[in-house]
Protein backbone atom coordinates (compact mmCIF):
# COMPACT_ATOMS: atom_id res chain seq x y z
CA UNK A 1 0.00 0.00 0.00
CA UNK A 2 2.77 2.46 0.89
CA UNK A 3 4.59 1.67 -2.34
CA UNK A 4 1.51 2.58 -4.38
CA UNK A 5 1.00 5.78 -2.42
CA UNK A 6 4.64 6.79 -2.78
CA UNK A 7 4.72 6.06 -6.50
CA UNK A 8 1.47 7.96 -7.02
CA UNK A 9 2.86 10.98 -5.17
CA UNK A 10 6.06 10.83 -7.24
CA UNK A 11 4.02 10.80 -10.44
CA UNK A 12 1.84 13.63 -9.17
CA UNK A 13 4.89 15.73 -8.36
CA UNK A 14 6.24 15.09 -11.88
CA UNK A 15 2.92 16.32 -13.24
CA UNK A 16 3.08 19.45 -11.08
CA UNK A 17 6.66 20.09 -12.20
CA UNK A 18 5.68 19.81 -15.87
CA UNK A 19 2.81 22.19 -15.21
CA UNK A 20 5.09 24.73 -13.50
CA UNK A 21 7.53 24.64 -16.43
CA UNK A 22 4.70 24.99 -18.96
CA UNK A 23 3.04 27.83 -17.04
CA UNK A 24 6.38 29.60 -16.65
CA UNK A 25 7.03 29.54 -20.39
CA UNK A 26 3.46 30.72 -20.99
CA UNK A 27 3.92 33.53 -18.48
CA UNK A 28 7.12 34.62 -20.24
CA UNK A 29 5.27 34.87 -23.56
CA UNK A 30 2.01 36.45 -22.36
CA UNK A 31 3.21 38.33 -19.26
CA UNK A 32 0.01 37.45 -17.44
CA UNK A 33 -0.28 37.97 -13.67
CA UNK A 34 -3.04 35.38 -13.32
CA UNK A 35 -0.73 32.71 -14.72
CA UNK A 36 2.07 33.87 -12.44
CA UNK A 37 -0.21 33.57 -9.38
CA UNK A 38 -1.17 30.05 -10.44
CA UNK A 39 2.53 29.16 -10.46
CA UNK A 40 2.65 30.01 -6.74
CA UNK A 41 -0.19 27.61 -6.00
CA UNK A 42 1.20 24.79 -8.11
CA UNK A 43 4.64 25.27 -6.56
CA UNK A 44 3.09 24.93 -3.11
CA UNK A 45 1.31 21.75 -4.25
CA UNK A 46 4.57 20.42 -5.67
CA UNK A 47 6.43 21.01 -2.39
CA UNK A 48 3.61 19.51 -0.35
CA UNK A 49 3.40 16.44 -2.57
CA UNK A 50 7.13 15.77 -2.30
CA UNK A 51 7.01 16.24 1.50
CA UNK A 52 4.13 13.79 1.84
CA UNK A 53 6.01 11.37 -0.40
CA UNK A 54 9.06 11.58 1.86
CA UNK A 55 6.97 11.16 5.02
CA UNK A 56 5.37 8.11 3.41
CA UNK A 57 8.86 6.64 3.15
CA UNK A 58 9.57 7.62 6.77
CA UNK A 59 6.35 5.88 7.78
CA UNK A 60 7.38 2.75 5.89
CA UNK A 61 10.66 2.69 7.81
CA UNK A 62 8.91 3.30 11.14
CA UNK A 63 6.46 0.41 10.72
CA UNK A 64 9.13 -1.81 9.11
CA UNK A 65 7.24 -2.32 5.85
CA UNK A 66 9.57 -4.90 4.34
CA UNK A 67 7.53 -5.11 1.16
CA UNK A 68 9.67 -2.14 0.02
CA UNK A 69 13.15 -3.11 -1.16
CA UNK A 70 14.59 0.06 0.36
CA UNK A 71 13.20 -0.70 3.82
CA UNK A 72 14.18 -4.37 3.55
CA UNK A 73 17.80 -3.51 2.72
CA UNK A 74 18.26 -0.70 5.24
CA UNK A 75 16.22 -1.60 8.32
CA UNK A 76 15.49 -4.31 10.86
CA UNK A 77 12.73 -4.88 13.38
CA UNK A 78 15.14 -4.60 16.32
CA UNK A 79 16.50 -1.18 15.34
CA UNK A 80 15.52 1.71 17.60
CA UNK A 81 13.01 4.11 16.06
CA UNK A 82 15.60 6.90 15.76
CA UNK A 83 17.79 4.71 13.55
CA UNK A 84 14.80 3.64 11.49
CA UNK A 85 13.89 7.27 10.81
CA UNK A 86 17.46 8.25 9.97
CA UNK A 87 17.67 5.19 7.73
CA UNK A 88 15.17 6.93 5.47
CA UNK A 89 17.77 9.30 4.06
CA UNK A 90 20.81 7.17 4.93
CA UNK A 91 20.70 5.34 1.60
CA UNK A 92 20.92 6.25 -2.07
CA UNK A 93 17.18 6.36 -2.79
CA UNK A 94 16.17 8.21 0.34
CA UNK A 95 18.92 10.80 0.05
CA UNK A 96 17.89 11.58 -3.52
CA UNK A 97 14.31 12.07 -2.37
CA UNK A 98 15.56 14.35 0.42
CA UNK A 99 17.56 16.31 -2.15
CA UNK A 100 14.41 16.83 -4.24
CA UNK A 101 12.59 18.06 -1.13
CA UNK A 102 15.32 20.61 -0.53
CA UNK A 103 15.20 21.74 -4.17
CA UNK A 104 11.41 22.13 -4.20
CA UNK A 105 11.30 23.97 -0.89
CA UNK A 106 14.00 26.39 -1.99
CA UNK A 107 12.22 26.89 -5.29
CA UNK A 108 9.01 27.75 -3.44
CA UNK A 109 10.85 29.99 -0.98
CA UNK A 110 12.48 31.77 -3.91
CA UNK A 111 9.04 32.59 -5.27
CA UNK A 112 7.84 33.93 -1.94
CA UNK A 113 10.85 35.96 -0.86
CA UNK A 114 12.07 37.55 -4.10
CA UNK A 115 9.13 39.75 -5.00
CA UNK A 116 11.37 42.78 -5.50
CA UNK A 117 13.27 41.16 -8.39
CA UNK A 118 12.01 41.53 -11.97
CA UNK A 119 9.33 39.05 -12.96
CA UNK A 120 11.30 37.67 -15.92
CA UNK A 121 14.25 36.94 -13.63
CA UNK A 122 12.01 35.01 -11.22
CA UNK A 123 10.36 33.06 -14.02
CA UNK A 124 13.67 32.14 -15.67
CA UNK A 125 15.07 31.02 -12.33
CA UNK A 126 11.95 28.97 -11.69
CA UNK A 127 12.24 27.30 -15.11
CA UNK A 128 15.86 26.27 -14.46
CA UNK A 129 15.09 25.01 -10.95
CA UNK A 130 12.12 22.97 -12.09
CA UNK A 131 14.01 21.44 -15.01
CA UNK A 132 16.56 20.23 -12.44
CA UNK A 133 13.78 18.98 -10.16
CA UNK A 134 12.17 17.18 -13.09
CA UNK A 135 15.45 15.48 -13.95
CA UNK A 136 15.90 14.27 -10.39
CA UNK A 137 12.29 13.08 -10.20
CA UNK A 138 12.65 11.05 -13.39
CA UNK A 139 15.92 9.59 -12.11
CA UNK A 140 14.27 8.66 -8.83
CA UNK A 141 11.19 7.16 -10.45
CA UNK A 142 12.93 5.10 -13.11
CA UNK A 143 16.36 4.32 -11.65
CA UNK A 144 16.41 4.75 -7.86
CA UNK A 145 12.82 4.33 -6.76
CA UNK A 146 12.57 4.13 -2.95
CA UNK A 147 9.08 2.64 -3.35
CA UNK A 148 10.08 -0.42 -5.38
CA UNK A 149 8.33 -3.40 -3.88
CA UNK A 150 9.05 -7.11 -3.61
CA UNK A 151 6.48 -9.85 -3.35
CA UNK A 152 8.33 -12.27 -1.05
CA UNK A 153 9.93 -10.56 1.90
CA UNK A 154 11.31 -11.72 5.25
CA UNK A 155 9.81 -10.69 8.54
CA UNK A 156 12.89 -9.08 10.12
CA UNK A 157 14.81 -7.20 7.40
CA UNK A 158 18.45 -7.32 6.37
CA UNK A 159 20.22 -4.63 8.35
Regions found by a protein language model. Give the residues of each.
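Polytopic transmembrane helical bundles with strong interfacial aromatic enrichment
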Residues: 1-159
Amino acid sequence: MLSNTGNFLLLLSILFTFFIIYQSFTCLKKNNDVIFKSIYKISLLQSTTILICFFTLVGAFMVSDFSLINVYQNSHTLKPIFYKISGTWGNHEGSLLLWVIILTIFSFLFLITNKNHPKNYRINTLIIQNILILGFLFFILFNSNPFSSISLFPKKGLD
